[in-house]
Swiss-Prot record:
Originating organism: Arabidopsis thaliana (Mouse-ear cress)
Transmembrane helix as UniProt keyword: no
Keywords per UniProt: Coiled coil, Immunity, Innate immunity, mRNA processing, mRNA splicing, Nucleus, Plant defense, Spliceosome
Family: Belongs to the SPF27 family.
GO cellular component, one term: cytosol
Subunit annotation: Component of the multiprotein assembly MOS4-associated complex (MAC) at least composed of MOS4, CDC5 and PRL1. Interacts with CYCL1-1 and CDC5. Associated with the spliceosome. Interacts with ENY2.
Organism domain of life: Eukaryota
Name of the protein in its database record: Pre-mRNA-splicing factor SPF27 homolog
Length: 253
């Protein structure tokens, strides 16, 4: 059955080949008509449906806790044998306190040891080392000044980028929600328009079931009568098979 423009109704169309999350050979197909199935409001039917759903969930291979099982496994991290954390593990096992970071020594001028105070080469070496340290501190001060001067503007620009990104994500989420709502409206429309045909077919099926039961009952009565006639004929000594062979078949008018 198709519409006037040739579109096939959703419930009657052949399902398209979708790309499942996991292409399992025993993937379960779940079908439902939530927009036209109103029998769930009946308490008796509701209890029976709940029982069937619970039974199906017990037999189902798709358990709620197994949804992530279809995804690739996470990489294994061996934190226990990590060389970076090895010393910390040893310190914790030994019950030692964490090593205190000495910030004061970074800002102190180093001097040659006492036994090299009269060595010009040692003084030149430590002088160069202190000059490099001083140059590093000057660079750090310049970076702090730049951060103090330009940092607020950079934060504002970063916040603006985050706001633009948030707006874009919200727009995409809204578009997806609109697509979901569109699909739900189409499903509702197709289910409601197809419900008339389904109801007619259900009514026809029930009538055929009643007719079949009536035919089956009539056939059972005829079989009982035939058995009764055969029994009566046997008691009277009649050979029904011989008599039936001599009867000419009825001609169709």
């Amino acid at each position: 059955m198709a519409t006037n423009n040739g579109d096939v109704l959703m419930l009657e169309a052949t399902p398209e080949a979708a790309r499942p999350w996991a292409s399992a050979a025993n993937a379960e197909v779940i079908d439902a008509l939530p927009y036209i199935d109103d029998d769930y409001g009946n308490p008796l039917i509701k209890s029976e449906v709940d029982r069937l759903v619970e039974e199906e969930m017990r037999r189902s291979s798709k358990k709620p806790a197994d949804f992530l099982k279809d995804l690739p496994p996470l990489p294994k991290f061996d934190f226990k044998n990590c060389p970076v954390l090895g010393k910390e593990y040893e310190r914790v096992r030994a019950g030692k306190p964490p090593v205190r970071i000495d910030f004061e020594s970074r800002y102190k001028l180093e001097m040659p040891p006492a036994n090299k105070r009269n060595d010009d080469a040692a003084w030149k070496q430590y002088l160069q080392k202190n000059q490099r340290s001083l140059q590093q501190k000057l660079i750090e001060l310049e970076n702090l000044e730049l951060m103090s001067k330009l940092g607020p503007e950079l934060w504002r620009q970063n916040n603006h980028r985050l706001e633009v990104f948030l707006t874009r994500m919200q727009r995409l989420a809204q578009e997806q929600n609109e697509e979901i709502e569109k699909v739900n409206r189409e499903r509702k429309y197709h289910q409601q328009t197809t419900s008339y045909e389904l109801n007619a077919l259900s009514q026809e099926w029930r009538q055929l079931c009643v007719k079949n039961m009536e035919i089956q009952s009539a056939c059972a009565m005829l079989e009982t009568q035939i058995d009764s006639f055969k029994k009566e004929a046997a008691e009277r000594g009649w050979n029904l098979e011989e008599k039936l062979e001599n009867v000419e078949p009825l001609q169709m008018q």
